[in-house]
């Protein structure tokens, strides 16, 4: 009888162990999902200190969990502590070497520590795991651009844009790479695309300067109040004082600012080479258009002036002469 009982126990023991292992795996899966959701919550909120406080005890309890180490690295990076982040992200990479995201964030950590060679190696490893990793392609392109390896950077920005055609950093820096490669025609096309998509982005003003330095004044930076506003050039139909659609759109932006700030006044300066009368008509047309669109804006707040000569504009690349142009800027009291 004892032998029978012992045999039954021996037979049941693997089943019991297997059931426990299955239960442990299920618990770990649920815990992992919870950690992922909560970790992303802290990252999305930018509450890195709270994330660190919540995850530090868990890393102490489960030091070999790659995801916990990853989130700790992200919280330390978010708190501008790359030295503290490094051991966590390195451990995450060691525990899960095939995770492209971990490799990418290892690269970001090396970037924060100003170690460009190690940064590049981490991005390249991420791309060896996942060639379509958008962020790794993008940041490796940045690394190459910083090194002056512009042709390689351009290829990587093209790859990033093939993965996300609207990626703003790739769009802008692609134009920078083209400028450095002295491919001005392509640079202009690339920068126009960026400005059409992101006219209010912080880099838009620099983009307009790049176009202007290349002799393209289809966009202008206008100093309005305390801001510099990139706008499409205020243009008219040839030989007339009739605004184009782009010209009207740019004036609406300026009109909105004048409408919102009653103490803001601007100069409207129009140049037409060899035709002072047309320059005058265009200056008055600008003022009249804003008055019609924004009745609260008194005409006196737009001071018109006009010249029958080209506008001369100095840039870092030299002096440019525009036969016809409109310049609008803040009127100093």
Q: What is each PLM-predicted segment?
A:
Residues 229-239, 251-283, 301-314:
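Short, surface-exposed beta-strand segments enriched in small/polar/acidic residues
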Residues 284, 288, 292-333:
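Periplasmic OmpA/Pal-like peptidoglycan-binding modules at the C-termini of bacterial envelope proteins
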Residues 37, 71, 105, 139, ...:
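Canonical tetratricopeptide repeat
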Residues 28-67, 71-83, 90, 108, ...:
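Alpha-helical segment of the N-proximal tetratricopeptide repeat
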Residues 63, 97, 131, 165, ...:
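Short coil turns that delineate tetratricopeptide repeat
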Residues 22, 26-29, 114, 180-265, ...:
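Periplasmic peptidoglycan-binding/tethering modules of Gram-negative envelope proteins
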